[in-house]
Amino acid sequence: MRPALSDYQHVASGKVREIYRVDDEHLLLVASDRISAYDYVLDSTIPDKGRVLTAMSAFFFGLVDAPNHLAGPPDDPRIPDEVLGRALVVRRLEMLPVECVARGYLTGSGLLDYQATGKVCGIALPPGLVEASRFATPLFTPATKAALGDHDENISFDRVVEMVGALRANQLRDRTLQTYVQAADHALTRGIIIADTKFEFGIDRHGNLLLADEIFTPDSSRYWPADDYRAGVVQTSFDKQFVRSWLTGSESGWDRGSDRPPPPLPEHIVEATRARYINAYERISELKFDDWIGPGA
């Protein structure tokens, strides 16, 4: 259920976020406690998740050099009290139709592509790589931006050129990889591996390319504890993979290949997911989540 904000017109709903109009140039981006997996929005919610996503994005927007869509601080007076801590005022952009994915390690859909073709998004890789193999240099592996309920599809860089032009495609690749490396280097100093991440970009009215939506959250990134890292096995994680793994495990009783939606998450999975998200934020930022603004769960 989305918050009814009397001062702002509701514009759109995503899997996790609600978007409201502030004025002709600005939007209010509100992160809910919803969680999605395998193209479904689950019936369960994760308490405080929207606040963690907002805190994490705000931290990384301040850390990385890439220009972004923020138009005010997390305590901007334009943010209503009822969504304080889970909302940001952002610039209205023309969003580009590409999910910009940076991969430092082989896992997830990238691993499936590699096992089937020896490539990821058209990039040929050496033989013998395994789950969680580290790449010598990070890869730019874009994907289509699917509608709600559809699957994102990994695409080649040449396809990105066809979609947005060569100049913009090169900007997207360079900005994605530079931003990933900057954040991943920071995370390693905190004992965290950012295995991969995805970004969205938009164009402002002056033609500038801006980083948008969320960045380096446990929803959009894979976080692994560096001390436990070992190639060849599925890694312990502080991200949404924990929920995906439960859904496809025997305890859930759910068949991913069926037409049935996933079951609700049991309380112990909800609590463990909340703890993992908060742990990721506190380790990366060296800040206490209890000090983050806004009403908690």
Curated annotation (Swiss-Prot):
- Report the SUPFAM superfamilies cross-referenced here: SAICAR synthase-like
The gene is purC
Annotated pathway, please?
Answer: Purine metabolism; IMP biosynthesis via de novo pathway; 5-amino-1-(5-phospho-D-ribosyl)imidazole-4-carboxamide from 5-amino-1-(5-phospho-D-ribosyl)imidazole-4-carboxylate: step 1/2
GO BP, sorted A to Z: 'de novo' IMP biosynthetic process
Q: Which family does it belong to?
A: Belongs to the SAICAR synthetase family.
Name of this chain's protein = Phosphoribosylaminoimidazole-succinocarboxamide synthase
What is the reaction catalyzed? 5-amino-1-(5-phospho-D-ribosyl)imidazole-4-carboxylate + L-aspartate + ATP = (2S)-2-[5-amino-1-(5-phospho-beta-D-ribosyl)imidazole-4-carboxamido]succinate + ADP + phosphate + 2 H(+)
Recorded GO cellular component terms are: cytoplasm
Q: What is the lineage of its organism?
A: Bacteria, Bacillati, Actinomycetota, Actinomycetes, Mycobacteriales
Q: Which organism is it from?
A: Mycobacterium tuberculosis (strain ATCC 25177 / H37Ra)
Which Pfam family name is an example for this entry?
SAICAR_synt
EC number(s) recorded for this UniProt protein: 6.3.2.6
Q: Which UniProt keywords apply?
A: ATP-binding, Ligase, Nucleotide-binding, Purine biosynthesis
InterPro entries per UniProt: SAICAR_synt/ADE2_N (IPR028923), SAICAR_synth (IPR001636), SAICAR_synthetase_CS (IPR018236)
MF terms (GO), sorted A to Z: ATP binding; phosphoribosylaminoimidazolesuccinocarboxamide synthase activity
